[in-house]
Amino acid sequence: MEYPFWVNDFDRIKNYRDSYPLSSEIFEQPQSFWYGDNPKKPKKHMEKSIRRLLNRALPQLPILVMYNIPNRDVGQYSKGGAATKERYLDYVERFTKGIGKDSPIVIYEPDALPHSTHLSEQEKEWRLQLMKESLQMLTDSCNGRFYIDVGHSNWLEPKVVAELLDKISNPKVKGFSVNSCNYRTTKECI
């Protein structure tokens, strides 16, 4: 990278370091910022939130995470996501407007790709098509550096991951990410 990942300045408001001294190492690490969709908030809220974050992070590189795929986490702990394809594509459009001409790292939909293997064949094809369509929208509409999340090191065989990536990727996607929502060690993931 030509510049370091942004480390959030949480401490400037709440003085967390003094309140939680054992956690100070955590505050010194880059953190990602997760964006889903909150129907209770005005539609422009996410766009403004992303713009504010990108402006605060300059000149460093923030990491954003998109996390709103329909049937997110296939009904497990983080279930939810957009209710319909249309709602999801609206979310994608608002996300791209938030990024604008900036180039943050964006982790695309943690666990959505490996979870597709837990769906019926029809649901799997629907999800993969939605992922392909939304990635095309994203890479055509903004300068984000997109990485498709492929789960963790103990989930799918590399051959299966490669086959799934072939179905949804496009040349503008920068690569893939691992372990975005798990607790595997770096050593396990390499």
Where are the regions that the model predicts?
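Distinct, well-ordered alpha-helical segments
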Residues: 119-120, 124-134, 156-169, 188-190
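Mobile, glycine-rich extracellular loop/lid and propeptide segments
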Residues: 63-69, 84-89, 98, 104-115, ...
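Catalytic alpha/beta core domains of metabolic enzymes, predominantly
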Residues: 171-190
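Structural preference for beta-strand elements that scaffold enzyme active sites
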Residues: 32-33, 59-65, 103-107, 143-147, ...
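A non-catalytic structural micro-motif
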Residues: 134-145
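Structural recognition of alpha->loop->beta junctions
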Residues: 89-103, 163-176
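Extracytoplasmic/secreted cell-surface and envelope-processing proteins
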Residues: 72-76, 114-118, 155-159, 184-188
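N-terminal carbohydrate-binding/catalytic regions of secreted carbohydrate-active enzymes
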Residues: 2-98
